Amino acid sequence: LYTKDSKRLSRETLALFDTLVYDIADVGCRYYTFLTTLRYCIEDCAAAGKRLVVLDRPNPLGDRVEGGIVRPDVISFVGGYEMPVCYGLTCGELAEMMNRELHCGCDLHIVPCAGLTRSMTFRDWGHCWVMPSMGIPRFETALLYPGTCLIEGTNCSEGRGTGDPFGIIGAPFIQAEAFCKAFNALGCPGLEATPVYFTPTASKHQGVLCGGIQLHILNETVLEPVAMGVRLLDLLRRMYPKDFAFLPPVREDGKIFLSLLAGHRDFEKPDWDADALLARYAEE
């Protein structure tokens, strides 16, 4: 499903089986592309007359719902369905919803989780965290990811190539102490930052000394990661207007990657307002 030429099931692959079993751990966040892969599996199996069995898994973020709804004009691999960033469903529930609302007609079967309650998070499972990918090494990473993944659409490092991906944010032009003080002054619930200097071993700014912050979760029950991510973008553009930038368009239609992540094009407007944007998210 992650080959270079296509992310869909090919005719040749579909001809190899009668039933496809989907057994993939997710992180409860729309950017994490396993959910788009699930949509493709539903659509491709429906078109080919194949059965799809989803082994349901609990959502590590529980019933957390946050962020705006993806607009139809920015549907992409990081936003493959019109839903919020944190969606509060299990993969089985999401599969049923997509199959129904997209009118796929897939022969879909869900093997449910035993003993699951809606409010459960990973803390309630009684298991060790198993990395769903190298970028999400800890549960704490999954908690921050809905907010700090927005940094992937900018010229700042989101911490890839460090020991704390999505927990360390920075760039060569950032003065760590001043930026940390300004971030903490925002009063993001459940969070505190400390200044950090780091040199990424991979991805953006590889081999270059960066200043920035490391995020520490003090109270995950009041955490608002998407709101934190929006305020982080706003702080970066205000403190470093000459250096901070969104990455250039990645598609022929001119849409920037940040718009695909966010699920809307508001960030492309020079006068976007963080408070107004977060108020709209809450309404949606």
Task: Tell where the protein language model's regions lie, with residue ranges.
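Short acidic catalytic loops
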Residues: 19-27, 53-56
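Glycine-rich oxoanion-binding loops at beta->alpha junctions
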Residues: 1-16, 29
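A short helix->loop->beta-strand "cap" motif at the edges of active sites that frequently abuts
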Residues: 45-51
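Conserved anion/nucleotide-ligand pocket segment
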Residues: 75-148
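Glycine-rich, aromatic-lined ligand/substrate-binding cores of catalytic
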Residues: 116-196, 200
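Conserved functional hotspot residues or short segments at active or partner-binding sites
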Residues: 170-281
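Glycine/threonine-rich flexible loop motifs
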Residues: 26-38
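Glycine-rich, charge-decorated loop segments at or immediately adjacent to ligand/cofactor-binding or catalytic sites
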Residues: 53-75
